[in-house]
Design a protein with these regions (language model features):
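Anionic-ligand anchoring segments at beta-strand to alpha-helix junctions in alpha/beta enzyme folds, i.e.
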Residues: 21-25
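A glycine-rich helix N-cap at a beta->alpha junction
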Residues: 40-49
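Alpha/beta enzyme core
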Residues: 1-18, 31-39, 53-167, 182-189
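Histidine-centered catalytic micro-motifs
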Residues: 168-177, 182
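Short acidic loop-to-helix transition motifs that present clustered carboxylates
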Residues: 27-29, 50-54, 175-179
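Conserved hydrophobic beta-strand within the GNAT/NAT acetyltransferase core sheet
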Residues: 20, 47, 110, 170-172
Length: 190
């Protein structure tokens, strides 16, 4: 109920994309997403999905317009949280699920968790081989640990834009008090 009220207010303000819930996490989140999607707002309704077909199917069933496709790319998460995924597995899975979601009619935002702790060579490959795919509508620079500096954000955003040709978004955390400065540097970089 509260999510629907907030979504209506955001829509009235002219917000063009509203990110609602993570339906794979709970039935309550799935109900909230469906309730917001059923409002018929002008804003596109997006939801978070893991890199799994069943998550994408749930987003479709709940009426989402698009997904924020989460997957690990920082080495600590790939090795310790996600059963030792390899870099190539991450790339292949991201491309496959992006295509699957696009075939279901969804917009796709590529959201590489822990991007700022990824090996630089791998992150560049990820942008070249997955981020540049036509199924990806935009790519997010995800600073999960809040460790990015404004200068690094500027360089990464410029490189991501060059490699993918896509709109680049920023997702920061304020662990070290730099979230706002990093966000502003990313916006200034394009």
């Amino acid at each position: 109920e509260e999510k629907a009220r907030i979504a209506k207010e955001l829509d009235a303000l002219g917000v063009d994309r509203i990110e609602v819930a993570f339906p794979a996490v709970s039935k309550e989140d799935a109900r909230a997403l469906k309730a917001v999607a059923d409002l018929g707002l002008n804003a596109d309704i997006f939801t978070f999905c893991r890199a799994r077909e069943d998550d994408v199917d749930l987003a479709v069933a709940c009426g989402a317009d698009g997904i924020i496709l989460e997957f690990p790319c920082g080495e600590p998460r790939m090795v310790h949280q996600f059963a030792k995924w390899t870099e190539q597995q991450v790339i292949d899975l991201t491309v496959r699920i992006g295509k699957y979601a696009k075939d279901k009619g969804l917009q796709v935002v590529m959201f590489p968790l822990d991007a700022t702790r990824a090996r630089p060579d791998f992150f560049r490959r990820l942008m070249d081989e997955a981020g540049a795919q036509p199924e990806m509508d935009s790519v997010v620079l995800v600073d999960t640990t809040g460790s990015l500096t404004p200068q690094a954000a500027d360089a990464l955003v410029r490189d991501m834009k060059r490699r993918t040709g896509k709109a680049i978004e920023i997702h920061t955390h304020g662990d070290f008090g730099m979230g706002v400065a990093v966000s502003l540097a990313a916006v200034a970089a394009g």
